[in-house]
Amino acid sequence: MAKKKLNSTIKRSRTRSGCVTCRDRHIKCDEQQPVCKNCQKSNRKCYRGIRLNFTQYTFYNPDDNKPKELQQNEQPNSSHYAFPNLEPNPVSQKHRILDQSITIASLYDDLKKYKPYIHLHTPEDLRESDLQFQEDTYNSYISTSAINLRGKKLTKRDPGLSTSLSVINPTLESEIKPNPVILNQLSFHPPPNLNTGVLYPPTATAATTTTSSPTNHHLHPYFVSSIPNPQHHPMLDTSQHQETTSTDPNQFDYSHLSMPQSTPLLMKYDITTYVRLIETEKYYMLLDLANELDIWKKIIPSLCLQISENDSFLLDCLMSCSRNTSVNLLDLTNEQLNKWSQLKNAPVISERIQQFEHILISIVLILLGLYLNTTKVRLTDYHKVIFNNQAKLFSHVLRKIHTFITSNKPNSAVLTNAIQSITMLKFFIDKNYDFSYEFKNIQKGRVTDTSEEITYSNSNLYSNPDISYISTFNEYEIIYLNNSYQNLVHVDQSNSMSMGESQLYKDLLWYLMKVDFVINYPEAANNLVLDHNVVYQQITNASTDLSFSNNLNYLNPRSYANYFLKEFIIKVLSMGSNAIIEDANNRINTLFNFIDQSYMDPELKSQFHHCFTWTVRYIHPVSD
């Protein structure tokens, strides 16, 4: 059979789709994507070039394709009474070729031969080149993965990709899209609507070593190296577009082009694991129900990244909340004790208060990580020891800083919220694992641990471990709960949030926690103050609120959480009345059904079941 002749008039260009690594080694690339076999065998970084050959460009001029009628209407001799052109007037843009030679050259031998030419490029062009390379690499990877993995089940695999310059290479199982909020956190720019005086008051800014100060914007190259935050603004009209100011050249930093960056933390965590923790797993959901600043979504991850340049402890604590990262809890808790040993005998002064704040943050993250990733069936005595020791350390820290934080207000919102979050987590942990029941019944008569020492190495701890600290309030928690933490919070913060749903959530939760403690430990609750008027109006309207069933699909997570707490308070205050308890249980089940059928993110649905199923499990009608 004769071969079909190719059309000689068609000019064909030779294309190269192999990786840059094989080309640099002068070997033939098998072109497997996203990682070629050569790089897999030799354990090398597989870079895939995006714009290596500047040969073909196509420009589109909108004026060339305008309808003739429109062009005639734009003639200067058109009628004075002609109708105005209602089509939007596009902003004229200059077409230019983006020179990415420096970005591509940085992949070859650390840019040694190209350093003399860096001064020929403006900082703006260099930055745009890096960002364009990042975007092209990301989009190319996602499209390739979508084709290769269509109809197949994703499996965990290390693709061997790593970061170079500002390039973020997602792992094979990643389905995460770029999120400006996450990129904003990576650069630790506090949200513009937050009052930095509330987050970090002036009294604590004179520290000699304020590791959490957001003044240093240099981050680890394994996360993002000198990438500006993408700012999303509404589309501007022509006049506004012309009035936009030019970019400040001082914000550009290209030190990575002149000197290699190396750090022992370079490959400790994959960037996609960090992004997935915030974007997909939404570890912060339960904690941020109690604050409208989204502290655990926006502030804490940025803080952990910021100080990890010198100390990765808080970042390790944060990553312990991830389902895809295995953090050694023994090493983590020992490091926590080492940091506490440096503070427990030190005087509490303004310059040192942030170090105590970091200890409190670590307690929150370790408790939360265990709570999210350990089911009741998988709970071991070792987990109980960690839970109890974290609560015990919390008691020691409060004893140390109580006088200072109550007499030197305002405290930072992070410090105050960390204290609140630990008490809240203790309550949810107690309900999830039934610690109060175990402490009152199984451990009844057992002498609780009264020593000041916190240890994880004593083998005797893992036989019928003590859970007294995680199950009960310490004296300082009782003081704070009695006045709803008003002796800690910033004055303006309490006023501005008084009408918010997060404040309602806290009012309901504080009341429920105190009532629950009085029921379980009446002998230890003499100092607790209960004000039933705080929630009386809320719970009396709870039974009628659910009549607006059509609106439940559009509620935010805080509204659902408030409904759960209201219904459980009704059950607690109505014990002995089977009809009321049964109606409350029916409404709670209705809430779960609405959540399952709503447009809520699937991860949030799962967390609601994990965090609030106890509202159904506790207190049922008593059969005659």
UniProtKB/Swiss-Prot annotation:
Residues 237-250 have a biased composition (Polar residues). Gene3D superfamilies: Zn(2)-C6 fungal-type DNA-binding domain. Coiled coil: none annotated. One of its GO terms (molecular function) is zinc ion binding. It is found in: Nucleus. Residues 19-46 bind DNA. Pfam families: Zn_clus. Keywords: Cell adhesion, DNA-binding, Metal-binding, Nucleus, Transcription, Transcription regulation, Virulence, Zinc. It comes from the Eukaryota. Disruption phenotype: Stabilizes the opaque phase. Transmembrane segments: none annotated. Signal peptide: none annotated. InterPro entries: Zn2-C6_fun-type_DNA-bd_sf (IPR036864), Zn2Cys6_DnaBD (IPR001138). One of its GO terms (cellular component) is nucleus. The keyword Metal-binding applies. One of its GO terms (biological process) is negative regulation of G1/S transition of mitotic cell cycle. Its main location: nucleus. SUPFAM superfamilies: Zn2/Cys6 DNA-binding domain (SSF57701). Disulfide bonds: none annotated. Interacts with MCM1. PANTHER family: N-ACETYLTRANSFERASE DOMAIN-CONTAINING PROTEIN, TRANSCRIPTIONAL ACTIVATOR PROTEIN UGA3. Transcription factor that binds the promoters of genes involved in biofilm formation, which include several key adhesion genes, and recruits MCM1 to these sites. Plays an important role in hyphal growth and virulence. Promotes conversion of opaque cells to white phase, but needs existence of EFG1, a key regulator required for maintenance of the white state. This is Adhesion and hyphal regulator 1. The gene is AHR1.
